[in-house]
Amino acid sequence: MILKSQDVLVLAKLVVIGGDEWSYGRMATTLWMSPSEVHAGVKRLIKARLASDQQNRITPNVRNLESFLLHGLPYVFVPDLGEITRGMPTSYAGPVLSPFFQAGEDLPPVWPDPDGEVRGQSFSPLYKSVPKAAREDEWLYELLSLIDAIRGGRARERQMAYGEIKKRMGLNAGS
């Protein structure tokens, strides 16, 4: 079993959903994926112990997720930084961390997106549909941009992103 980058997108959506009911079809629509991709991703997440299936209710395993984000994600899903493009700001330039970090001379990291309004350096999203899914779900956008700060940020950015994610997961942990 090999975890795929789109599985992290599915896991992020599970965190956002919290204890609310969901279906594979509805999640697939909101993530711009096929239901079979979502289903396969959930199976891999359960096998990797990043999610659990209790009484036909699939939820994130918060402890394991925290450990994976800090100790696994930055080494497994390293982002590709590329050319200058238009897109959606992510990582330290995303909606949560941008107030704490000055842009300086560097262009902000962005997910390439033809509808993007910011010019920056291309930062590969976890999955091709991330910009579309993030545009439709602000909480998901915030979480994915924090995950990107862990994937490709500097030490201070990673530390701050990890703290923000822990706070947010704490809000949904008991849901």
Q: Where are the regions a protein language model picked out?
A:
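Short acidic, hydrophobic short linear motifs in intrinsically disordered regions
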Residues: 19-31
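Recognition helix of helix-turn-helix/homeodomain-like DNA-binding domains
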Residues: 30-33, 55
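Exposed, interaction-prone assembly regions rather than primary DNA-binding/catalytic cores
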Residues: 76-163
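Short amphipathic alpha-helical interaction segments
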Residues: 32-47
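N-terminal, charged low-complexity regulatory/assembly segments
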Residues: 164-175
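Intrinsically disordered, low-complexity basic tails/linkers immediately adjacent to helix-turn-helix/homeobox/MYB/SANT
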Residues: 56-86
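A short, conserved structural fragment
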Residues: 46-58
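Short alpha-helical segments that sit at the start of domains
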Residues: 1-17
